[in-house]
């Protein structure tokens, strides 16, 4: 069961529609894929979608790191040594977390397939299904309401509203959504570092009781300012851009805790193994987990879902990153029904090349 072939390539997946967040408008999506094949014909696949604005990693850096560093570590190695191989990869690809995530996901997929198990059952299943949020970008009120209506019609009831450009317009959108849809929806907010402290206080005061929680309200480097906020705000604030890997998670466990929720993204932390490291810390510290994503192939969305379902600390999913892709290279990976996600019963990630 030795890895005999490693294939690395880049795909332009594109979006069906662009969307705007606090610091950019996104209209294009490129992912780097890794395919591992053993000498007995079993394959494992992984995908990387770097977030340059968050981690500094470009798609070129992702592809280059994998092309240069993967084969010396994995070529000819026995998949039964996958956890040792993951440790080697963690060291070699530490500066390119999306590249590390692609390799990590492929190894996990391959290991679970070798054992004939869905990945979550190899990791230790805790959850069978959970609802995911779906994202509405920054847009005028009329378009916000129309998009919310569309998503409700598709079975989603949890909406993540992007904010952070204009706090008064943000407040108006939240209030109008509540007036229009009331108990039909649950709202979460993602400010993407867009607020100053005074704006956050104002937003919180005007929307209290309407929003379940707010993601990354202040800039990532303003950790001390987050710690000085009232506990009522910190408890419903989720760390995103502030939380890259396990080291960041450990730092945020100390009082006063700046966030009550951690948002784990495989592309920030380096894949399933580092993600579960963060999850274990959060679980011991009674911090709730959300598992999020970039614009990603079903491959890595499935990886995040399997990891999420193996952690007792998981409370929230925000795994809509493949839903607006114009194309993908796989199908399967998960079953989505009325906004609820569950894994398939297929071995590994449960994805199939198209």
UniProtKB/Swiss-Prot annotation:
- Give the EC number(s) listed in the UniProt record: 5.1.1.-
Q: Which SUPFAM superfamilies match?
A: Enolase C-terminal domain-like, Enolase N-terminal domain-like
Q: Which residues bind substrate?
A: 135, 160-162, 265, 295, 318-320
Is Isomerase among this UniProt entry's keywords? Answer: yes
Give the UniProt keywords, A-Z. Answer: Isomerase, Magnesium, Metal-binding
Q: How is the cofactor bound?
A: Binds 1 Mg(2+) ion per subunit.
Residues binding Mg(2+), per UniProt: 190, 215, 240
**What InterPro entries does the annotation carry?**
Dipeptide_epimerase (IPR034603), Enolase-like_C_sf (IPR036849), Enolase-like_N (IPR029017), Enolase_C-like (IPR029065), Mandelate_racemase_C (IPR013342), Mandelate_racemase_N_dom (IPR013341)
- What does it do? Catalyzes the epimerization of L-Lys-L-Arg to L-Lys-D-Arg (in vitro). Catalyzes the epimerization of positively charged dipeptides, with a preference for substrates with a basic amino acid in the second position. Has epimerase activity with L-Lys-L-Lys, L-Arg-L-Arg, L-Val-L-Arg, L-Val-L-Lys and L-Ala-L-Arg (in vitro).
- Name of the protein in question: L-Lys-D/L-Arg epimerase
Q: Taxonomic classification, please?
A: Bacteria, Pseudomonadati, Thermodesulfobacteriota, Desulfobacteria, Desulfobacterales
């Amino acid at each position: 069961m030795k890895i005999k072939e490693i294939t690395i390539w880049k795909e332009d997946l594109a979006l069906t529609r662009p969307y705007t967040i606090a610091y950019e408008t996104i209209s294009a999506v490129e992912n780097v894929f890794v395919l591992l094949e053993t000498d007995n014909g079993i394959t494992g696949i992984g995908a990387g979608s770097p977030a340059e604005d968050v981690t500094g990693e470009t798609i070129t850096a992702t592809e280059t790191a994998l092309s240069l560093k993967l084969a010396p570590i994995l070529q000819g190695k026995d998949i039964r040594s996958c956890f040792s191989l993951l440790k080697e990869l963690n060291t070699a690809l530490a500066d390119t977390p999306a590249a590390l995530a692609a390799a990590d996901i492929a190894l996990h997929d391959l290991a679970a397939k070798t054992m004939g198990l869905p990945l979550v059952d190899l990791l230790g299943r805790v959850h069978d299904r959970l609802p995911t949020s779906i994202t509405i970008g920054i847009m005028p009120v009329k378009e916000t309401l129309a998009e919310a209506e569309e998503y409700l019609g598709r079975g989603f009831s949890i909406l993540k509203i992007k904010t952070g450009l204009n706090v008064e317009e943000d407040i108006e959108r939240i209030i109008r959504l509540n007036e229009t849809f009331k108990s039909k929806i649950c709202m979460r907010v993602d400010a993407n570092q867009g607020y100053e402290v005074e704006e956050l206080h104002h937003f919180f005061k005007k929307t209290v009781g309407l929003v379940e929680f707010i993601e990354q309200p202040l800039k990532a480097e303003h950790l001390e300012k987050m710690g000085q906020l009232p506990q009522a705000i910190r408890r419903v604030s989720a760390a995103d851009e502030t939380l890259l890997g396990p080291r960041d998670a450990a730092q945020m466990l100390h009082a006063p805790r700046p966030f009550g929720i951690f948002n784990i993204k495989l592309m920030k932390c380096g894949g399933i193994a580092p993600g579960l490291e963060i999850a274990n810390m959060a679980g011991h510290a009674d911090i709730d987990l959300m598992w999020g994503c970039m614009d990603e192939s079903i491959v890595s969305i499935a990886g995040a879902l399997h990891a999420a379902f193996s952690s007792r600390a998981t409370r929230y999913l925000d795994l809509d990153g493949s839903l607006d892709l114009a194309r993908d290279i796989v199908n399967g990976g998960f079953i989505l029904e009325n906004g609820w996600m569950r894994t398939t019963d297929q071995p590994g990630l449960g994805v199939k090349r198209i």
